[in-house]
């Protein structure tokens, strides 16, 4: 990858957030993290569509990941979204309803997240 991609990672579970940030920063991504959807939304508004991908949990306090994804797709349509969740029997239905570009069920291997991330980015960028 020649371009450094900017990622916003949002999860209310601090351990998961830290693990995702540590792993992906070692892969040469530019990482911004948020502990909840409202904080993530503030970063999005501040950066004015500078994030290439948002990775967000679906179930969070204040604003759900589903609502957040809907907002992202309306305000920042070029931003790719990966939804992650460990909740519910049909998380894909929630994420599909919110128009996530990809869904991953927790727990997942970090290498699978990286593979999905690269696949999404290659569909949009020449990498």
Where are these regions (language model features)?
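Alpha4 helix (beta4-alpha4-beta5 surface) of REC/receiver domains from two-component response regulators
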Residues: 67, 87-104, 115
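Two-component/phosphorelay signaling modules centered on CheY-like receiver
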Residues: 14-32
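Active-site beta3 strand of CheY-like receiver
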Residues: 49-55
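Receiver (REC) domain active-site loop signature in two-component systems and cognate sites
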Residues: 60
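Acidic catalytic/metal-coordinating carboxylates
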Residues: 35-39, 64-68
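C-terminal output helix
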Residues: 108-119, 125
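Active-site residues of response regulator receiver
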Residues: 11, 57
């Amino acid at each position: 990858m020649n371009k450094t991609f900017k990622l916003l990672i949002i999860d209310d579970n601090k351990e998961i957030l830290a693990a995702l940030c540590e792993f992906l920063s070692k892969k040469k991504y530019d990482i911004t993290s948020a502990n909840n959807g409202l904080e993530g939304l503030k970063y999005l508004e501040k950066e004015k569509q500078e994030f290439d991908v948002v990775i967000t949990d679906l179930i969070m306090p204040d604003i759900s990941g589903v609502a957040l994804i809907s907002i992202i797709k309306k305000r920042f349509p070029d931003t790719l979204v990966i939804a992650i969740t460990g909740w519910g029997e049909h998380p894909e239905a929630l994420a599909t309803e919110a128009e996530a570009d990809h869904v991953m069920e927790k727990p997942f291997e970090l290498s699978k997240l990286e593979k999905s991330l690269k696949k999404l980015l290659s569909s949009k960028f020449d990498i």
